[in-house]
Amino acid sequence: MKQIYYVIQALIHGRGANIIKVVSLGLGLTMSILLFSRVVYEQSFDTCFKDHDKLYQLWNIWTVNGEPFPPSEFIIGAAAGGILDAMPEIVESAASTGSWPVSAPIYNGSVRFDDFKVTADSLFFQTMGIEVLSGDPVRELQQKDVIFLSKDLADKMFGGENPIGKIISFNKEIELTVKGTYAALPENCTMRPKAVISLPSIWSRRIGNYSWNGGDSWKEYIRLKQDIDLDELNKRIDMVVQQHIPRSDKLGITVMAKPVRDTYRGYDEVKRMRNIMLILGISILFITTLNYVLISISSLSRRAKSIGVHKCSGAGTGTVFGMFMWETGIIILLSLFLMVFLMFNFREFVEDTTAAKLESLFAVERIWVPLGVTAVLFLIGGVLPGRIFSKIPVTQVFRRYTEGKKGWKRPLLFIQFAGVAFICGLMWVVMLQYHYVINKDPGYNPERVVIGVNNAPDAKARLAARHFYEGLPYVEALTSATSYPSNGYSGQMIPDEKGTSLFSSRYDFTQENYVAFMGMVIQQGRVPRESGEVAVNEEFVRRMHWGKDVLGKSIQTEEGRVKIVGVIKDFNIDGFYSELKPFVLHHHPRDLADLVYLRLKEPFGENLQKLKRDAAEAFPNQTVGFESLEQKMADSYNSVRVFRNATLLAAIAILFITLMGLIGYINDELQRRSKEIAIRKVNGAESFVILEMLVQDVLWISFPAVVAGTLGAWYVGGLWMEQFAVTVGSLVPYYVCVAIVVLILIVSCVISKTWRIANENPVKSIKSE
């Protein structure tokens, strides 16, 4: 107990330095634990399903003229069922699901619910390994107009009432009967529906292509009875598929299975961000730990005498070591309290930055992450200084202790300076790229444009809806289409004159005024005005190798043979993650297509709210909702925004931590060299000379460290930039500027801390010796 008493007294006596330790450790622990927890959380995706190691997802690989396309998790509808029928000795069950046919909201009375839903067959729950709480899905999901609700959605819709037998509405068009409930799924799974609608509900209305011939828009899964070599499994699956798909010399398809757990963590962007977050987490933890070591060891000269007193009183090496470990433990505990305070007081921001709820990040099965990070900090941050302190000889009680060797301090400072340059450089590049893609001209004008779904059931209702929207005083213009650019559009294969598939092109059906409404540019010809006419973009022309002679040519599409009457200037499709894509613009003959486009007058936000209210009153029996196109575009870069926030927080934390370590180093140097400085001044050295000497001492460490850190930022920033088709340009000037700013901050910190002693009377320093 005496050890703890002396430790507490030492902490109180040095409370100024200890507050700095607590704050720097608290910030470092917060950032590193959040980063490591996020990495582990992402690696745990899809482990919530029962016996997840037996659950596999099916993937498509299309081949055009022998050239394979990247694997796609959206596959042809009949594949899963066909594999189950052909391989009953291996496959226990199979399921087909689709979210696009049931993307509209469901209603309980007049209350709208936009929760994620899928349509699925009767073996969905058995295949996925999801616990069914009530109902018989194998029997009920074979019927049309049936829905199963997750427990949390059922509670939200009906409170404590039994939902079985309740009638709800899909899109105010189809009445669905609730036939069962199932356990809610955690956030970390790729298939997490809040409601499951029976697949016959879709089939009976002839929605979608559910066959062996195209229609690759379904997510499908199989559950195995027994372990089997993955290569052998995929070989047998491919044999089944080849027996059923239509024969084609030009177009081929391969279906393969992958463990469901590899789906999320196999995405390129997830693997890229995992590596970057690991680097950031390790950097911050390493720098935080070494900063604590640096601050602790820098207090050696101040604390040597008290340790000598303890040893004179009978304390051995182990006792002194134990006292320092107790001190480290208490400081880390206080830092953890600060971390918890920060996380819960800034919970919304933290959850937005990590893209996960705190209770998910720190679930019981992942609590080892913060414990492990804390243990690493305690062992390195406690053992290294503790051993140095415990070896101080008892003779230090009789004389002033000055540690003349700087070998152990310089590497610590080097690592911290390199870490600051690395994280600040990466942060600046991420911020520049985010600003660039958000503000770059996409080739059309989304300003004040809103998009809503047209649910008018017939031509008369469509015409009435058009007149209603055009008559609103705050609507500037109206047009219509079946999709929108940032959504990526659907695709179709474009063949040559011999029927050989050349490439996949995006396409849309729009009204005649669509191009002018969107601010797109016609390079040649005009817009389509009737069926059988199309306009193509410049990239389409390049893919066809037509040169400038384009107008009047015809191409084969899924709509038949069509004539090209115009060429549109290239515009961005599917965000700046993708290269330019070929595009075909068809004419839509009806008054309104699937989507209604409106350009509103200012004030935009106020008029959008008026539009939602007026449309809901005008069409009470339809699902009506409008969203800003600019907001949809911004949402597509949400992961970039989140990473920008994370790097900004990391940069602020690491800059504060490093400056605290630098201040500790400077204080120790000033105390160690105070007599030398005084003698130099007595011998005629000016204040500027003293400052120059101390600044050069730090620059010998900081300059190569900042160069190394900047090179690291350049490498990691390059990895992160790989996800974009367009980038901000040459980043070298920005990296150089960041390096210079970091060096200026370091030099400014040195000058501010040494200014007083460089200008004080040297007699005071000599007297204190």
Language-model regions, residue ranges each:
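Mid-to-C-terminal secondary-structure elements
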Residues: 121-134, 147-269, 467, 471-636
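Intracellular coupling helices
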Residues: 4-16, 20, 24, 290-331, ...
